[in-house]
Amino acid sequence: MAAKDVIFGGEARARMVEGVNILANAVKVTLGPKGRNVVLERSFGAPTVTKDGVSVAKEIELKDKLQNMGAQMVKEVASKTSDIAGDGTTTATVLAQAIVREGMKYVAAGMNPMDLKRGIDKAVTALVEELKKASKATTTSKEIAQVGSISANSDEAIGKIIADAMDKVGKEGVITVEDGKSLESELDVVEGMQFDRGYLSPYFINNPEKQSAILDNPFVLLYDKKISNIRDLLPTLEQVAKAGRPLLIIAEEVEGEALATLVVNTLRGILKVVAVKAPGFGDRRKAMLEDIACLTGGKVIAEEVGMSLEKVTLADLGTAKRIEVGKENTIIIDGAGEAKDIEARVKQVRVQIEEATSDYDREKLQERVAKLAGGVAVIKVGAATEVEMKEKKARVEDALHATRAAVEEGIVAGGGVALLRAKQAAGAIKGDNADQEAGIKLVLRAIEAPLREIVYNAGGEASVVVNAVLAGKGNYGFNAANDTYGDMIEMGILDPTKVTRTALQNAASVASLMLTTEAMVAEAPKDESGAGGGMPGGMGGMGGMGDMGM
């Protein structure tokens, strides 16, 4: 086992903060409408130019092990915020840096880190409550477009295309992002359906880049029981193989010998097949299988209606233009079902919604309507070069996550204003002792950081702007894009509540861990110089022995 360095107390925390600052300083230059670009080196090909905070954070790995630990902890803040809310990574990083910087002063002054942490937690809980109170539901297409634009670094075209996509497939609909073929971004709406079940074995994957199985023009077999015996399936497999088309099997379960045989046939290239578990449970599973049958123009093979697997013909199978099966979900695009049958099915489910007694049942039935009627929207991102395409695609994905978050939990005023208003509303939080009070105070000071950074990146004087915004009320804030003050929501500067909330909670969580750190253990650096000097000496000795032998 390699030797370890153990560093304690102030020195450990100081080195960790150095790492935090290096990462946060690189990430925060991208914040706000006048944020700058960061260029990332690639081992081959052109470098990547980005304004996406989490992309910058993911690239950073520091040489000094202790600094690197600090940097990695803040990187965790960015990626966790990105995973949950899809945006707000730069805000989260700026907040984490500010809380750590303020907190370290108190720790150095001899305050109890555990009480500081309790104070921080109290402040964050109060601020999150205030954010939820201030939150406003997103209802109009215009608001959705504004959220998308802000998240895509003030690109209005991206906001508009996402709002159009949501208009077409509904807020619950499925929206995917692909590389386009032209200079302009385009929106395609495809009749389709998504359900939350993925492939039963990773050996079915035929697109390693997307880690998914893609079937073009496949047959779809729907069965409401388990398949464990391959003999039951053989007649169907032979017919499909003769037709030379792929097959998607959706059943309660495919296991044992049946699954093994399907995997072997796929690996040998004899048959392109993917097996997926049927979505839902109990009666809901049967209903969802019927939905898929309606969409693909097939039948559910069920023993209760006198059908069995051995007697299946190609006419009983559904078909679709394309099916994508990922690890956790399956998208059926352009099923061959008749439009009038799908309409009738949707009407039938809508009647059930009206008759439903529980909220849970109603919600599940509404999901089914969205899946049947909604379809899949595909945003094709257009750009002049591949470098621009990658950067733009990342921004579109960010914006899509942000708009979903806005639909889920509503919106608050953007540009760092919501946090300042929450601070004013939560001004009366009390701690149990002086150290907890200090923890509360440091959070209330740190939440000015996002606005300060936005102003700094726009070339303004941060303190002047913060004071002016604090003097205002409601959604009054600073628009850094054109250096004006006014109502942020009217100016279209919005943030999803979920993004602001997640950024604050994750930043405070990791910052608290850093403040309560007392020791760090890292691998000791290897002594390169000593080892290098020994080798030539040894070799020289051997040469001498040869001379003696002569």
Curated annotation (Swiss-Prot):
The keyword Chaperone applies. It comes from the Bacteria. ATP binds at residues 30-33, 51, 87-91, 415, 479-481, 495. Gene3D superfamilies: GroEL, GroEL-like equatorial domain, TCP-1-like chaperonin intermediate domain. This is Chaperonin GroEL. It is found in: Cytoplasm. One of its GO terms (biological process) is protein refolding. Belongs to the chaperonin (HSP60) family. Its EC number is 5.6.1.7. It comes from Polaromonas sp. (strain JS666 / ATCC BAA-500). Together with its co-chaperonin GroES, plays an essential role in assisting protein folding. The GroEL-GroES system forms a nano-cage that allows encapsulation of the non-native substrate proteins and provides a physical environment optimized to promote and accelerate protein folding. Forms a cylinder of 14 subunits composed of two heptameric rings stacked back-to-back. Interacts with the co-chaperonin GroES.
